[in-house]
Amino acid sequence: MAARNEIRPIVKLKSTAGTGYTYVTRKNRRNDPDRLVMKKYDPVGRKHVDFREEK
């Protein structure tokens, strides 16, 4: 059961707009070994911005 968590860990995506809004998602470490960056909607800033993975 521990292998499942190692391959696809849960990560937080924090808004780069500085609003403090976060999304929670899973990522595959084999396909994305670097920090994840996704463009998503920030409801606090009311626009689409980049969300970066935080540790």
From Swiss-Prot:
Annotated signal sequence range: none
Q: What does the record list as GO biological process?
A: translation
Q: Which Pfam families match?
A: Ribosomal_L33
Cellular component, GO annotation: cytosolic large ribosomal subunit
Record carries keyword rRNA-binding: no
**PROSITE patterns registered for this protein in UniProt:** RIBOSOMAL_L33 (PS00582)
Q: Which GO terms describe its molecular function?
A: structural constituent of ribosome
Q: Which family does it belong to?
A: Belongs to the bacterial ribosomal protein bL33 family.
Protein name in UniProt? Large ribosomal subunit protein bL33B
Its taxonomic path starts at: Bacteria, Bacillati, Actinomycetota, Actinomycetes, Mycobacteriales
Q: Which gene encodes it?
A: rpmG2
